Amino acid sequence: MEITFQKVEHRYQYKTPFERRALYDVDVSFPSGGYYAIIGHTGSGKSTMIQHLNGLLQPTNGTVQIGEHLISAGKKEKKLKPLRKKVGVVFQFPEHQLFEETVEKDICFGPTNFGVSVDEARQKARKAIELVGLEPELLTRSPFELSGGQMRRVAIAGVLAMEPEVLVLDEPTAGLDPKGQNELMEMFYKLHKEKGLTVILVTHNMEDAAQYAEQIVVMHKGTVFLQGSAEEVFSHADELEKIGVDLPMSLKYKRAIEEKFGISIPKATLSLEDLTHEVVQVLRKGGHESCSS
């Protein structure tokens, strides 16, 4: 299910003295089946942008085409329920939205709300909890008896139980320890590969953006600043830093090595393994030349 923004503008508190423009002139497409990252400094428009993906926000100007659904400025989309089934959104700290007395009831809430029978919802809950790497035995437990990481997985299972075609992740690993962050990101990538899910990840973690995303969209002051593969985007390191976007650690180490040893590493290395390989190659070629990047 392809998603396309055309000349999208969004203003909060439109036509009031408190009006504030959060998005403008946003032109971007997310073809079906891809893995995308949206990055940018705090306040760049990332969260506003993703709230247009399932009709939580409507553009002030422009259009958002989500599969067969067209959301236009000034026109109310009447069939948002089917859209919200197809586009699942995992907001920051989704565990704060848990409220039922058992894990099973919490996961079943979404499917039953969309008209699925109780028995079918239970089947979906069992599949979903296994997808997020939890034991089915937890279905009878209170979600509030679980660890923070388990609670987050339960909340994500509630989104997956609706079997969305698009999974939107807003800082999904915020507040987790490094091990929990890595496990969750690997889980999302596995779902993307095995289920063919389109994944749109909003993140401040540049390592995650570089490692997982096929395409990266850089937002700045409410519009698209850069778009391309990780290699293309992070080759603009100086420009990214000027707009407050962090760089992957491998690029920071690359700069430090170039400055320390007076060598030039031409390739934009996006992992420490790549960086090690490139340094070895340069040194083998006698690369002690003045640093040019």
From Swiss-Prot:
Location relative to the cell: Cell membrane
An MF annotation (GO) of this entry: ATP binding
GO CC annotation terms, alphabetical: ATP-binding cassette (ABC) transporter complex
This enzyme's EC code(s): 7.-.-.-
Transmembrane segments: none
Residue ranges constituting the ABC transporter domain according to the UniProt record: 3-246
Annotated binding of ATP, by residue: G40, H41, T42, G43, S44, G45, K46, S47
SUPFAM superfamilies: P-loop containing nucleoside triphosphate hydrolases
Keyword field: ATP-binding, Cell membrane, Membrane, Nucleotide-binding, Translocase, Transport
Membrane topology: Peripheral membrane protein
Major localization class: membrane
Pfam families referenced in this protein's UniProt entry, alphabetically: ABC_tran
Primary enzyme class: translocase
UniProt similarity note: Belongs to the ABC transporter superfamily. Energy-coupling factor EcfA family.
PANTHER family from the UniProt entry: ENERGY-COUPLING FACTOR TRANSPORTER ATP-BINDING PROTEIN ECFA2, HEAVY METAL TRANSPORTER
Summary of subunit composition and partner proteins: Forms a stable energy-coupling factor (ECF) transporter complex composed of 2 membrane-embedded substrate-binding proteins (S component), 2 ATP-binding proteins (A component) and 2 transmembrane proteins (T component).
Protein purpose: ATP-binding (A) component of a common energy-coupling factor (ECF) ABC-transporter complex. Unlike classic ABC transporters this ECF transporter provides the energy necessary to transport a number of different substrates.
Protein name per its UniProtKB record: Energy-coupling factor transporter ATP-binding protein EcfA2
The organism of origin for this protein: Bacillus cereus (strain ATCC 14579 / DSM 31 / CCUG 7414 / JCM 2152 / NBRC 15305 / NCIMB 9373 / NCTC 2599 / NRRL B-3711)
Lineage: Bacteria, Bacillati, Bacillota, Bacilli, Bacillales
